[in-house]
């Protein structure tokens, strides 16, 4: 890595604060042009004036409320890229790539095919061969986007609206994979490095799974809970058609049960009534599952880079979309979340910790213990706090205490997980970092930010009945994790970190890891931060657009 002597964030700070040295202790205010210094806000005002006149209703006006632009309205460098973007373009409503990433997760369901094949062979006496599987896959790729296969006089969906919808298949059996239609095969041997491919095939075995991508427009109109139902209905119709079955016979009920329940793997679990969301919604996605969705680990062997990509993507899902909109509703959470994936600040802290660990312990080179947790968490936390003290522009970049606390603790947690190969040790280091940080600065963030951090030490190195679970299986709905921004994305990175250090093929679920090794997805899950940048630069083309069915101009 060899990044110890180079502050990764300095280049971004020098460009953001032109004319000011990052070390300068004094600065100026009210001389930057207010909101007009921002190209994007000037565009907002221009649009808003026209629309206010057209609507006859007051609209966006940046002169209302606190004066904007007292200091520089900073551009942000997307970490790990050369792209500088305006902060407004990182709000998920303004960023098509973030929207598509969330949609791609919500619209995905994995369904095992072995139960259905057993019903065909044992109950109905129908032979299942690679040829019949290929015919079924062709049928489901007609039916899943909204094509009719069993009944006449059924309305169908325009293919141009759902060109993002398809089904693919994968298996751990190389002989079967060789005979399957390559157009719809996720080839584990091709998509993963050899050692990872062997690990995945060992866990998957001879079983066969299909990955269904329901149309983006469906999860836009409905929700993630719709996905398994949409999928199951078309699976049933496709089996009936491909294997020439009678739609009314009793065995069809077994297909329905398998497709809707028994063989279904969803991305997220259903949430309790007070959070009131169905399966496949962001609040039900465990941290380890999200880490498996991100694909950097199959194209990079750098544990720090892998963990940072997970954190960056998770920041948009958990903090911006889930907590910032589903649970809170507003615009402010983007500012918290983007601290983890902009200006190479977290990158600098994580690489510092990774190098410290590699030199002293080696990756996965020491058993987890409180002594190890204390050593690494203290070293990385103090390093991070020293940077904020040495570079005032860094402090201004992360102007909120909760931003600083999240970034420093994330580096401490990931670094400890790199050393121990243990995510629970990593999350314990996160909590120790928060305590050290509060001791040094007297506060962390907004009132309630550190609620979970004050009680986290007791439930991260022990498994208790009401606060159990290894860290990879925890998620946004875990006790105490439900409503504090600046935690969940970093927790996902800490779930990934030990597995990245060990070179594991997956974190929690090999099926989910394989399902997203799919080059036909519009969002590139290998490099999510690059995709977020493309969205901010308006270079990303999303799926699910309605151009075909609306007037040329509204």
Curated annotation (Swiss-Prot):
Pfam families membership: MCR_alpha (PF02249), MCR_alpha_N (PF02745)
Annotated residues for binding of coenzyme M: 336, 447
Cofactor note: Binds 2 coenzyme F430 non-covalently per MCR complex. Coenzyme F430 is a yellow nickel porphinoid. Methyl-coenzyme-M reductase is activated when the enzyme-bound coenzyme F430 is reduced to the Ni(I) oxidation state.
Transferase listed as a keyword: yes
Subunit note: MCR is a hexamer of two alpha, two beta, and two gamma chains, forming a dimer of heterotrimers.
Family as reported in the entry's similarity comment: Belongs to the methyl-coenzyme M reductase alpha subunit family.
Protein name per Swiss-Prot or TrEMBL: Methyl-coenzyme M reductase II subunit alpha
Organism (species): Methanothermus fervidus (strain ATCC 43054 / DSM 2088 / JCM 10308 / V24 S)
Gene expressing this chain: mrtA
């Amino acid at each position: 890595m060899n990044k110890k002597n180079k502050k990764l964030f300095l280049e971004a700070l020098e460009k953001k604060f032109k004319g000011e040295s990052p070390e300068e202790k004094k600065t100026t205010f009210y001389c930057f042009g207010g909101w007009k210094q921002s190209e994007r806000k000037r565009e907002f005002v221009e649009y808003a004036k026209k629309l206010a006149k057209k609507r006859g209703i007051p609209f966006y006006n940046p002169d209302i409320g606190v004066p904007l632009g007292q200091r520089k309205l900073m551009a942000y460098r997307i970490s790990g890229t050369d792209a500088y973007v305006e902060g407004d373009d990182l709000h998920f409503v303004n960023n098509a790539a973030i929207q598509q990433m969330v949609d791609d997760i919500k619209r995905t369901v994995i369904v095992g095919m072995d139960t259905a094949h057993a019903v065909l062979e044992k109950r109905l006496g129908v032979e299942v061969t690679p040829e019949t599987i290929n015919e079924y896959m062709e049928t489901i790729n007609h039916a899943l986007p909204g094509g009719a296969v069993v009944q006449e006089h059924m309305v169908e969906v325009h293919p141009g609206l759902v060109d993002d919808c398809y089904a693919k298949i994968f298996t751990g059996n190389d002989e079967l994979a060789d005979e399957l239609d390559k157009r719809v095969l996720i080839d584990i041997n091709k998509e993963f490095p050899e050692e990872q491919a062997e690990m995945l095939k060992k866990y998957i075995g001879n079983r066969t799974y299909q990955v269904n991508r329901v149309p983006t427009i469906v999860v836009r109109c409905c929700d993630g809970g719709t996905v398994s139902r949409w999928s199951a209905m078309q699976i049933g119709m496709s089996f009936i058609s491909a294997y020439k079955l009678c739609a009314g016979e009793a065995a069809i009920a077994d297909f329905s049960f398998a497709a809707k329940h028994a063989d279904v793997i969803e991305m997220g679990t259903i949430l309790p009534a007070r959070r009131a969301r169905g399966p496949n919604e962001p609040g039900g996605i465990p941290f380890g599952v999200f880490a498996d969705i991100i694909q950097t680990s199959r194209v990079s062997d750098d544990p720090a880079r892998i963990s940072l990509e997970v954190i960056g993507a998770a920041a948009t899902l958990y903090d911006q979309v889930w907590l910032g909109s589903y649970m809170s509703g507003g615009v402010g959470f983007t500012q918290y979340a983007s601290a983890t994936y902009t200006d190479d600040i977290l990158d600098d802290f994580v690489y510092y910790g990774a190098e410290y660990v590699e030199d002293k312990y080696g990756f996965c080179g020491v058993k987890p213990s409180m002594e190890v947790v204390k050593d690494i968490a203290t070293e990385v936390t103090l390093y991070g706090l020293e940077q904020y003290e040495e570079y005032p522009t860094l402090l201004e970049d992360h102007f909120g205490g909760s931003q600083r606390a999240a970034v420093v603790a994330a580096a401490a947690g990931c670094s400890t997980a790199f050393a121990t190969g243990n995510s629970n040790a990593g999350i314990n280091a996160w909590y120790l970092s928060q305590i050290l940080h509060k001791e040094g600065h007297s506060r962390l963030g907004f009132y309630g930010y550190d609620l979970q951090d004050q009680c986290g030490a007791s439930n991260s190195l022990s498994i208790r009945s009401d606060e159990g679970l290894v860290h990879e299986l925890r998620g946004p709905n875990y006790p105490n994790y439900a409503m504090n921004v600046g935690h969940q994305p970093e927790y996902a990175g800490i779930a990934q970190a030990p597995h990245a250090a060990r070179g594991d093929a997956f974190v929690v679920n090999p099926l989910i890891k394989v399902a997203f090794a799919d080059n036909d997805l519009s969002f590139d899950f290998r490099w999510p931060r690059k995709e977020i940048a493309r969205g901010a630069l308006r270079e990303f083309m999303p799926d699910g657009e309605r151009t075909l069915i609306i007037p040329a101009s509204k």
